[in-house]
């Protein structure tokens, strides 16, 4: 039993099919006990009998193992190989593993046997799976090298096995560990026919959604904004333009052609001149004004109809020309040779009426054509500028001369048409027409064009539209010239070691900036802590870190360990260090510029080299298309569409050329700008999709399905157009400099926002404010406010900052003490702050105060609304009588000074207002007098000031009763007149200040006699003012706002503002 098994195993290993079959069939007991799925163990790499039978293609044993012994072809050995792997390897691959030498002499027979065994394995069905299907041989199983059975079959060149595997859904695109597909394996082993067959099946493989992708790509408009034209296309384009123009103008073809030629073949320009003055337009073009065609003439021609007999002479012949008739027979004479024109000669009619014999016509036209003046041939008569129609030229000259005339005519058509250029390549007779989209064009091709777009004549000749040189988009011609000049100056072929030199210069600069050399061995030393006594770790030299001199020269007299007082030596060392640093910086900057240039130049050359390599694909693309068509036609019966290969190569070359020229464009962009960042992002995106398409197309054998190549081509085309359109639009707007931030509260206003005509005027205004003369009493007032403020007497004043109820009296007499908050506010008072003055002026403008003391009707304070200051300024009603309150800056300043002085005195001694003082005439202003009191004006003033403060500062403002009212315990209504009792000391002090108060009131009344500042009125002023002010918020924290509001509130009869 054991001997039979051993002999059978050896026969299987050696590939002796006859001996193995004899042992297997002759011993029924051994046959019954044999397990084809049992492994022979680790010494035999865990191969099974089925593995060895498949390796040597033993047909009878494989059939018996699969269908009689329940053999499983999916069983793997130690290399993760199944029976299919070993079967498809072939004798070339298994040469060192058995007696396969005789099979080389019979390769066809061996391939046939392996195909039969493969077919049996593919027909095998195993156990029933969970999904209701039966287990089958896995044709896509991979071994340790990630190779499938199709890889081995393709490498062995077994065409029949490959076809069977492909029919059974073998994966054509799977790659092994060497990133090779089955097609690559066949090509590597020089099985070209098999590789071409696999390539065609890979390219034209159908997957779900592939047809939709191809149909979508076919429906796309892949036209470019230019069109290559042949000579026939140029003639057809010219004829169509003439016919369409003649139809629009209702003119003969010859007239329409002459008009177009005179207007550079621009129909829009012609129509504009035609609509302006048609007769003058025809006169400048050398043609007569078209008239309705007479009977017997064609509508679109100038030649007479064949049905109409020819007249003896033109009806428009002048009297002078009538004398040229022959006196004998009445025949016309030729105006050139003076010979009689025979009646049997074909007529040459001109609209001008001049007649010449046919021989003279032919000689004249031949001479003009030979001279190259084919587009402007006038009548040969003296001082006649009538153009000769094309029909006349074609009917007179010979056929050869007519062809030459047509060539000159087409050349003149192209030369005079700014939308058409000839191809600059030698011996190329093609032209290019460029279509520039107009503004708001709805055509899908109406993306913006570059200044110097690249065009193609149709033969692959790319050139710049502007300079007719090599195509260089997205660069314009000037940028391209600058780049070429830069390359010639830098000589990059001589800059091989720029990167290394740049790194050395950067290291040298860092060492000079962060270290010092040893005074003995010049080794760089970096100090991070400690005293000035340094010891070189290399040469053990002791020196001073400051002056780099020997440490022996230092002692306590030179500053000790942490100072060095040797001035001359230190200065010398610093100068040397500075010179070395400056030199290193220059060197580093120079190498930095060189390194930057090499960065762009290297990538420029890389794309240029790739373009040269991929340009060869144009020659092989057509051959590849024919080969794929022939290889795939046997299966489908109809040749497939292979134009996608050529389209992909063309798109790849276009994009590669743009990427090549994009680096010169990026080189001249402003460094670290938004435009450059966006441009480089788009450039990187375009490079990624271009390289992906290159990997799919630039291969000896394509390994990508057609729909994926089509999708990649379309994606590259879309990215390319977006890239060029973005560059044409400017990529991104230029980076604008940061605008100066305006400061409002507590600071200065911009001159334009304040209404000044220029910054100089605003500066002059500020200068006048700072240097104005002080009035009598100002210095005393400021001195008393800032220096002589008495201290609080008791602790009860510390609570003066708390808010009181609205019903508390605000008109109690003031004592000589102030709360701490009032003292701080008065001490920080800044009378030069222009913000408070601006607020007063705006309030006066809105109030509309007049010169006369009569009250004016005004609405509630717009300052209480939530609108901003500019909107409130715009909402001021325009009246026919402008208000007097719009005072100048100097008047407003003087008024502010007077109010401040008046407010300081009045707020400290008595709750009065300026209307309670006598004016210059001795009359007194009473608050209850309707002729001089406007409560809405006062409320509007304070409301606008509070609204302005709220707009300038996000925090809020709280107005509370002043601390002066804290001393009183009685409660009075806010709107009642002030009737507080004064002590004798207060009366005496009041009398001493009466002169100063009168002077302040007089100044204020002189500058603004119509100003009333009185919050007290009979119309419940407490309710009005508090309601208006509480709408604006509750507190502020800015120092400037606190000073302004406090200074105004302090003078506003019993109100003050404090910081909470």
Swiss-Prot record:
Binding site for Zn(2+) 5: 544, 547, 554, 564
Amino acids binding Zn(2+) 2: 352, 354, 379, 384
UniProt entry tagged with the keyword Protein transport: no
UniProt enzyme class: transferase
Active-site residues, as the UniProt record annotates them: 531
Region annotation (TRIAD supradomain) ranges: 330-568
GO molecular function per UniProt: ubiquitin conjugating enzyme binding; ubiquitin protein ligase activity; zinc ion binding
UniProt EC number: 2.3.2.31
Region annotation Disordered: where it falls in the sequence: 284-322, 779-801, 850-889, 965-997
Chain segments annotated as coiled-coil in the UniProt record: 603-632
Family: Belongs to the RBR family.
Cited PANTHER family: RBR FAMILY RING FINGER AND IBR DOMAIN-CONTAINING
Protein name per Swiss-Prot or TrEMBL: Ankyrin repeat and IBR domain-containing protein 1
């Amino acid at each position: 039993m054991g001997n039979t098994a051993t002999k059978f195993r050896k026969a299987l290993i050696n590939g002796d099919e006859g001996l193995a079959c004899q042992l297997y069939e002759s011993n029924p007991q051994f046959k019954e006990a044999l397990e084809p799925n049992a492994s022979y163990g680790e010494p035999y790499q865990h191969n099974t009998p089925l593995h060895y039978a498949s390796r040597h293609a033993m047909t009878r044993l494989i059939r018996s193992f699969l269908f009689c012994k329940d053999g499983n072809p999916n069983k793997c050995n130690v290399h993760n190989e199944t029976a299919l792997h070993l079967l498809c390897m072939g004798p070339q691959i298994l040469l060192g593993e058995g007696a396969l030498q005789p099979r080389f002499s019979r390769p066809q027979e061996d391939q046939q046997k392996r195909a039969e065994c493969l077919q049996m394995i593919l027909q095998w069905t195993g156990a029933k799976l969970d999904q209701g299907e039966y287990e089958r041989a896995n044709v896509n199983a991979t071994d340790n090298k990630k190779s499938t059975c199709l890889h081995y079959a393709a490498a062995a060149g077994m065409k029949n096995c490959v076809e069977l595997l492909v029919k059974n859904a073998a994966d054509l695109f799977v790659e092994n560990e060497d990133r090779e597909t089955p097609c690559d394996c066949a090509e590597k082993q020089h099985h070209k026919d098999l590789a071409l067959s696999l390539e065609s099946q890979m390219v034209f493989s159908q997957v779900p959604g592939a047809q939709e992708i191809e149909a979508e790509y076919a429906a796309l408009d892949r036209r470019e904004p230019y069109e290559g034209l042949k000579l026939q296309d140029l003639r057809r384009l010219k004829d169509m333009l003439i016919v369409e123009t003649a139809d629009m103008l209702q003119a003969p073809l010859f007239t329409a052609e002459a008009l177009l030629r005179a207007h550079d073949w621009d129909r829009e320009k012609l129509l504009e001149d035609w609509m302006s003055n048609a007769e003058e337009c025809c006169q400048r073009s050398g043609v007569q004004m078209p008239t309705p065609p007479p009977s017997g003439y064609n509508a679109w021609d100038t030649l007479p109809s064949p049905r109409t007999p020819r007249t003896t002479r033109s009806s428009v012949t002048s009297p002078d020309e009538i004398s040229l008739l022959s006196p004998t027979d009445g025949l016309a004479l030729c105006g050139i040779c003076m010979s009689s024109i025979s009646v049997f000669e074909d007529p040459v009619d001109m609209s001008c009426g001049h007649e010449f014999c046919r021989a003279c016509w032919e000689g004249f036209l031949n001479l003009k054509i030979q001279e190259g003046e084919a587009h402007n041939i006038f009548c040969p008569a003296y001082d006649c500028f009538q153009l000769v129609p094309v029909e006349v030229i074609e009917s007179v000259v010979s056929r050869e001369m007519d062809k030459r005339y047509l060539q000159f005519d087409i050349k003149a058509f192209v030369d005079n048409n700014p939308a058409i250029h000839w191809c600059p390549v030698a011996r190329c007779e093609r032209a290019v027409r460029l279509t520039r989209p107009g503004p708001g064009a709805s055509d899908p091709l109406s993306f913006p064009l570059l200044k110097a777009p690249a065009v193609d004549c149709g033969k692959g000749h790319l050139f710049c539209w502007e300079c007719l040189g090599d195509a260089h988009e997205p660069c314009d011609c000037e940028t391209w010239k600058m780049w070429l000049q830069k390359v010639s100056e830098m000589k990059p072929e001589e800059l091989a070691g720029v990167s290394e030199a740049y790194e050395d210069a950067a290291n040298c600069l860092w060492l000079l900036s962060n270290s010092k050399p040893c005074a003995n061995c010049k080794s760089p030393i970096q100090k991070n802590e400690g005293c000035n006594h340094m010891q070189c770790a290399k040469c053990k030299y002791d020196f001073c870190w400051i002056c780099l001199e020997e440490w022996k020269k230092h002692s306590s007299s030179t500053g000790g360990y942490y100072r060095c007082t040797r001035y001359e030596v230190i200065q010398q060392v610093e100068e040397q260090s500075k010179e070395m640093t400056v030199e290193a910086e220059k060197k580093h900057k120079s190498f930095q510029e060189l390194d930057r240039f090499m960065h762009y130049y290297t990538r420029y050359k890389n794309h240029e080299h790739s373009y040269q390599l991929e340009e060869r694909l144009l020659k092989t693309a057509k051959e590849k298309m024919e080969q794929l068509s022939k290889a795939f036609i046997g299966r489908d019966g109809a040749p497939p569409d292979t134009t996608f290969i050529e389209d992909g190569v063309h798109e790849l070359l276009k994009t590669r050329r743009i990427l090549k020229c994009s680096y010169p464009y990026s080189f001249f962009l402003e460094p670290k700008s938004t435009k450059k960042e966006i441009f480089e992002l788009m450039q990187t995106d375009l490079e990624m999709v271009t390289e992906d398409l290159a990997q799919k197309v630039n291969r000896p054998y394509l390994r990508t399905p057609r729909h994926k190549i089509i999708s990649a081509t379309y994606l590259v085309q879309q990215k390319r157009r977006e890239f060029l359109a973005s560059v044409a639009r400017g990529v991104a707007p230029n980076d604008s400099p940061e605008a100066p931030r305006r400061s409002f509260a507590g600071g200065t206003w911009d001159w334009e926002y304040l209404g000044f005509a220029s910054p100089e005027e605003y500066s002059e205004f500020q200068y006048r404010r700072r240097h104005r003369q002080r009035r009598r009493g100002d210095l005393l007032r400021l001195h008393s406010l800032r220096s002589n403020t008495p201290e609080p007497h008791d602790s009860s004043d510390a609570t003066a900052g708390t808010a009181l109820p609205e019903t508390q009296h605000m008109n109690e007499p003031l004592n000589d003490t102030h709360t701490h908050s009032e003292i701080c506010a008065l001490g920080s008072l800044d009378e030069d702050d222009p913000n408070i003055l601006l607020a007063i002026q705006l309030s006066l403008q809105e109030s509309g105060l007049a010169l006369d003391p009569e009250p004016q009707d005004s609405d509630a304070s717009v300052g209480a609304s939530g609108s901003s200051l500019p909107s409130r300024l715009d909402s001021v009603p325009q009246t026919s009588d402008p208000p007097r309150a719009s005072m100048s800056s100097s008047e407003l300043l003087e008024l502010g000074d007077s109010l401040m002085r008046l407010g300081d005195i009045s707020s400290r001694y008595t709750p009065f207002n300026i209307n309670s003082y006598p004016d210059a005439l001795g009359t007194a202003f009473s608050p209850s007098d309707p002729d001089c009191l406007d409560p809405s004006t006062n409320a509007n003033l304070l409301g606008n000031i509070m609204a302005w403060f709220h707009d300038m500062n996000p925090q809020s403002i709280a107005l509370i009763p002043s601390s002066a009212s804290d001393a009183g315990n009685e409660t009075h209504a806010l709107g009642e007149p002030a009737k507080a009792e004064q002590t004798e000391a207060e009366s005496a002090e009041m009398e001493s200040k009466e002169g100063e108060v009168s002077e302040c009131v007089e100044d204020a009344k002189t500058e603004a006699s119509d100003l009333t500042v009185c919050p007290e009125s009979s119309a419940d002023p407490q309710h009005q003012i508090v309601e208006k002010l509480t709408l604006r918020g509750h507190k502020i924290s800015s120092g400037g706002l606190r000073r302004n509001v406090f200074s105004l509130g302090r003078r506003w009869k019993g109100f003050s503002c404090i910081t909470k």
